[in-house]
Amino acid sequence: ETIKQKNEKVIIFTEFRAIQVFLKRLLLERFGLNVTTVNGDSNTNRRVGLTRQGIIDKFQETNGFNVIILSTVAVGFGVNKQKANHVIHYTRSWNPAKEDQATDRAYRIGQDKEVFVYYPTVVAEEFSTFEIKLDKLLSSKRELADDMLKPNADLKNELFELLNE
């Protein structure tokens, strides 16, 4: 409701077709939106200008509140979605780099609003849910990747010593 009142755009990422269909129906019932879904089954035809980026461009060109449902695998790389400033990872990828790449598409040149990223999570007091465990795993993978890509001073010195031997 808050996003609708602000007339902002939303990208929802999920790989699962059943969830895509469910969300599309829910958004139609709740907001009267005919939501576009782009996934591996999306028909694309370059000759008539129907490409995944073309479908996303059409979404971006509409004024006001709108939602698009995307598959991270189908559109995580190589397309820009900077008119949307709300990114919802409805289901999570096992690979944090894919998630980050998909999210980063909303931060491209032309984005003039603050970007909000959401990870809906089921929480239970009695036990650690799958979503909580997956979030911890993805955070750990991100930290490991950051450590390898941006080594601290000790690791840098150790690497230089190994290279100079």
Task: Please place each PLM-identified region on the residue numbering.
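Short, surface-exposed basic-aromatic patches at helix termini and helix-loop junctions that form
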Residues: 27-31
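Conserved helicase ATPase core of P-loop NTP-dependent helicases/translocases
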Residues: 11-13, 21, 32-75
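Residues at the starts of beta-strands that form the adenosine-phosphate
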Residues: 9, 34, 114-116
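Conserved helicase/translocase motor-coupling segment
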Residues: 1-26
